[in-house]
Swiss-Prot record:
Family: Belongs to the multicopper oxidase family.
GO CC aspect terms: endoplasmic reticulum membrane
Induction: Induced by potassium deficiency.
Record protein name field: Multicopper oxidase LPR1 homolog 1
Keywords carried by this UniProt record: Copper, Endoplasmic reticulum, Glycoprotein, Membrane, Metal-binding, Oxidoreductase, Signal
Source species: Oryza sativa subsp. japonica (Rice)
Length: 582
């Protein structure tokens, strides 16, 4: 299967490029100063935070939720990111072109009620953003924009996972080698929480998400959640989808047309960072809030930017969940470091504010952790305008939330070593590509767990960047973060042997131990992997809320993947197959 997939990808690249299926022509060159001037011309906090349209993933029959089928399309249209910026051409999700939004509609599902979604592609023959045919990429023979949808954080069958090789163009005119069905099934059997859906096409994830193919997905269960007493209802329980973008003066979304090493990769660069920060599709919006508790489900949908979030009036975040799952008890945090694709579920009590306004600000360097500090533009996120009057508030933050299965590292049946590499061009020292365990996505799977088991993965980061590690299907938790000593010697050995055990990793992973933050000690689907450290994660291949097996065959084709969720890294080629076996 993998050999056929690899051959199919190669043929698509050769035939597609030969047939003229190329990235769009480059506009006149633009400088970073110009992009900053465009962003700087936009007055902050003049657009109200949008509430994205909601689509229910069930119908009520005799007082109970019942399964339904949805049809959601991907469309090209215009979107206003700011009052003073011309409308931008975007790719967006919706039930029609007229109702499609950036981000897409929030799908609200009921726990235990399956949902079927037919994803349809109505996108044009050519992409609105540049892409690079020299990285492994879905390139159809007859043009079109390949897409495929992944429900991030979902526990669902492999056929509904959105394999990078299961892409399709408009009208299913062409499909990838792993494509099997236009309709995906989401069991919604997992714990209530917030997920998000986004494009996952081979080599195009960074361009397709930058264009707007993303949206929120919330699983609810009133019987489980109502007793907690957390803020609820559309006004007081809000999804915040964060994304950085840069714009041309005409409103077009900027993406680089020239690569960091053009003679190797004409377009690819290791990270995309935008000057404007958007929340729910608006640049630096504001939200008027009452003096009471609010629940915010924060999702970082940026390509590469980390956010270190805090409120300028000193109010803390009370973290109640992360990455679709609740914590066992609330944790108070003055700031939140949110990696790419990571989510945090927090409560903010505005009744405790001594000011009438609070800015949500960002202090995370980019790239993280050793890049440049945020500036006056990308260091701001949004503003809360706080009512002077005291408001009625019946919500609370309980002392206890929800319990899931124990970490139980001793139950692990397998210990794996996962090593992150960055490869450099000898002439320039710039990165050319990134691999996990020195292998490509097209290479045979080496991570082959069995459903119902626990594994320990020792994730070793030999690159300069922090990487948000995402496993499809599985749920995991970091338990230890240990620094590497004599790292150069270890890197030298790994360059020769590519084997952590033979390179005596136990002798090197004895450095400083960094505590996992309390609000990250929960079951997650994204964990930050710090450079120069070995991070121990305990991985569960079953439902962590109940301890039960998956309610579907997780060993079916085309399997799953795990990858770095910095999209520019994932596309080139920091992604590997994850194949469960019987």
């Amino acid at each position: 299967m993998r050999a056929k997939v690899e051959l199919a990808v190669l043929l698509l690249v050769l035939v597609g490029v030969a047939a003229g299926t190329r990235p769009p022509s480059a506009p006149p060159p633009v400088t970073e100063d110009t992009l900053q001037k465009v962003a700087g011309s936009l007055e902050m906090y003049v657009d109200e935070l949008p509430q994205m349209p909601k689509i229910y993933g069930f119908s009520m029959r005799h007082g109970h939720p019942s399964p339904i089928r949805l049809t959601i399309g991907m469309y090209q249209k215009k979107w206003k990111f700011h009052r003073d910026l011309p409308a931008s051409t975007v790719f967006v999700f919706g039930t029609s072109a007229a109702t499609a939004t950036f981000p897409g509609p929030t799908i609200e599902a009921a726990q235990g009620v399956p949902l079927s979604v037919t994803w349809q592609n109505y996108l044009p023959a050519r992409h609105i953003l540049p892409w690079d045919p020299t990285v492994p990429t879905a390139i159809p023979r007859r043009g079109g924009v390949p897409t495929v949808v992944h429900l991030h954080g979902g526990a669902h069958p492999p056929q509904s996972d959105g394999s990078a090789f299961a892409w399709f163009t408009a009208g299913f005119g062409e499909t990838g080698p792993a494509w099997s069905t236009p309709t995906y099934t989401y069991p919604n059997a997992q714990s209530p929480g917030v997920l998000w859906y986004h494009d996952h096409a081979l080599g195009l994830t960074r361009a397709n998400l930058l264009a707007g193919l993303l949206g929120a997905y919330v699983i609810r269960n009133p019987a489980v959640e109502a007793p907690l007493g957390l803020p609820c209802g559309d006004e007081f329980d809000r999804v915040l989808m964060l994304a950085d973008r840069s714009f041309y003066a005409d409103g077009s979304i900027y993406m680089n047309y020239t690569g960091i090493i053009p003679n190797i990769h004409p377009q690819w660069q290791p990270e995309y960072f935008g000057e404007a920060i958007t929340v729910n599709g608006k640049a630096w919006p504001f939200l008027a809030v009452a003096r009471r508790r609010y629940r915010f489900r924060i999702i970082n949908t940026s390509n590469a930017r980390y956010f270190n979030l805090s409120l300028t009036n000193g109010l803390p975040f009370t973290v109640v969940g992360s990455d679709t799952n609740y914590l066992s008890k609330p944790v108070t945090a003055a700031s939140l470091l949110v990696s790419v694709a990571e989510t945090f579920d927090v409560v903010v009590d505005f009744s405790q504010s001594t000011s009438s306004e609070a800015e949500l600000v960002n202090t995370a360097p980019y790239p993280y952790p050793d890049g440049q500090a945020p500036n006056d533009l990308n260091g701001k996120v949004m503003k809360f305008v706080i009512s002077p009057a005291k408001a009625k508030d019946t919500s609370r933050v309980p002392a206890k939330l929800l319990d899931y299965v124990a970490v139980a590292e001793e139950e692990a049946v397998q210990r794996r070593y996962i090593v992150m590499y960055e490869y450099e061009d000898a002439a320039t020292g710039n990165p050319t590509h990134l691999y996990i365990n020195g292998k490509r996505l097209e290479d045979p799977a080496t991570e082959t767990p069995r459903p119902g088991t626990t594994e320990v993965w020792e994730v070793i980061n030999l690159t300069p960047d922090n990487h948000p590690l995402h496993l499809h299907l599985a749920t995991f938790q970091a338990t230890r973060v240990r620094g590497l000593v004599d790292e150069d010697a270890f890197k030298g050995c790994m360059a020769k042997l590519n084997d952590a055990v033979r390179c005596n990793v136990s002798r090197h992973a004895v450095g400083e131990e960094v505590a996992v933050p309390e609000h990250e000690k929960g079951w997650k689907n994204v964990v930050k992997i710090a450079p120069g450290y070995m991070t121990t994660i305990v991985v569960k291949f079953f439902m962590v809320d109940s301890g039960k097996p998956y309610p579907f065959d997780a060993t079916a084709e085309p399997g799953y993947v795990y990858h770095c969720h910095i999209l520019d890294h994932e596309d080139n080629a920091m992604i590997r197959p994850l194949k469960l076996i019987k």
